[in-house]
UniProtKB/Swiss-Prot annotation:
Belongs to the encephalomyocarditis virus protein 2B* family. Residues 18-27 have a biased composition (Polar residues). The lineage of its organism: Viruses, Riboviria, Orthornavirae, Pisuviricota, Pisoniviricetes. This is Protein 2B*. It comes from the Viruses. GO terms for biological process: viral translational frameshifting. It comes from Encephalomyocarditis virus (strain Rueckert) (EMCV).
Length: 128
């Protein structure tokens, strides 16, 4: 049976920053640029995606395909077509291909100005 064991530290490597709060954008840049998947694409990729037991055993990060990318940044040769295709396919499977693009530090500041950013809130905002 699958049992979820909460981890005491999500990012054990001090060099790994959280892509959510953008505290260490340089840590994400190799993965983001080579995969061409934006922050919003990754976030949307993870929303509602079930995690299997293998996922938790294999990845010590909590954000799925981003964790695979970050885990392999220490091994540049691993960042090849196979891993790239896997991460990109994960987000495309969740209908996030429209949010793909290189990570930009201005993305979080000007996220509402992005053409491909379609939050569910916009529907309520326009209809109210």
């Amino acid at each position: 049976p699958f049992m979820f064991r909460p981890r005491k530290q999500v990012f054990p490597d001090p060099r790994s920053g959280s892509v959510i709060n953008g505290s260490n954008p340089t840590a994400e840049r190799p993965c983001q640029q080579s995969y061409g998947i934006s922050f919003y694409g990754f976030a949307r990729c993870q929303r509602g995606r079930p995690k299997s037991n293998e996922d938790y055993k294999d990845i010590k990060f909590s954000i799925g395909c981003m964790g695979k990318c970050k885990r392999n940044t220490k091994q540049p040769r691993v960042l090849e077509a196979a891993l790239e295709q896997m991460c990109a396919a994960d987000c495309r499977d969740d209908n996030s291909s429209d949010a793909s693009g290189p990570f930009d530090s201005a993305l979080l500041r000007n996220i509402d100005g992005r053409r491909d950013y379609k939050p569910d809130k916009s529907v309520r905002r326009n209809s109210s």
